[in-house]
């Protein structure tokens, strides 16, 4: 988690690097929030909640194409925690990780992003926007948040460098990089 030094009215969070996996939580059963609560055990957990979990909490459903194939919920308990506070680093670990950090080699691979594909074409997008604009004009709503997914392939991906580049382009107070098996979440 990285705050990029951006102040936030409610303090935000420390910059934290969570490394390694002691335990992973990725359930398939229906009562996932209760299972997550039992898994927590007052330990540090990092992860995410997917958009479609709304269907578990309310009588809602969506039939969106899933191009990323992430589980709807996943959390892990890290082996090592590194807290960055100004010019200091505090390490919480059950083992000495400094030697491992010193031996780590940098990956200097440059990523090549192929042309991303929109989940809907331009004509459909314009049609949806016109319908949403009409709802606003009719007074049905005063604000609408419309999103569309873009997906694509990245060759020779260096996800850490890509995250760093995105973060430099658009720093935010709640930036995050997460690896989930062979998938990555870059939230910058």
Each predicted region: which residue ranges?
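Extended alpha-helical targeting/anchoring segments
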Residues: 1-188
């Amino acid at each position: 988690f990285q705050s990029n030094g951006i102040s936030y009215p409610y303090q935000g969070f420390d910059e934290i690097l969570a490394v390694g996996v002691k335990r992973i939580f990725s359930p398939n059963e229906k009562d996932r929030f209760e299972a997550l609560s039992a898994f927590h055990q007052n330990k540090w957990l990092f992860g995410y909640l997917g958009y479609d979990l709304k269907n578990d909490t309310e009588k809602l459903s969506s039939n969106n194409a899933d191009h990323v194939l992430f589980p709807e919920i996943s959390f892990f308990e890290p082996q090592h925690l590194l807290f960055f506070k100004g010019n200091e680093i505090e390490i919480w670990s059950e083992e000495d990780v400094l030697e491992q950090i010193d031996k780590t080699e940098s990956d200097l691979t440059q990523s090549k992003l192929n042309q991303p594909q929109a989940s809907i074409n331009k004509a459909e997008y314009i049609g949806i926007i016109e319908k949403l604009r009409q709802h606003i004009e009719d007074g049905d709503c005063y604000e609408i948040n419309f999103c569309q997914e873009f997906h694509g392939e990245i060759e020779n991906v260096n996800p850490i460098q890509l995250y760093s580049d995105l973060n430099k382009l658009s720093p935010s107070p709640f930036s995050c990089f997460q690896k989930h098996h062979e998938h990555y979440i870059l939230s910058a």
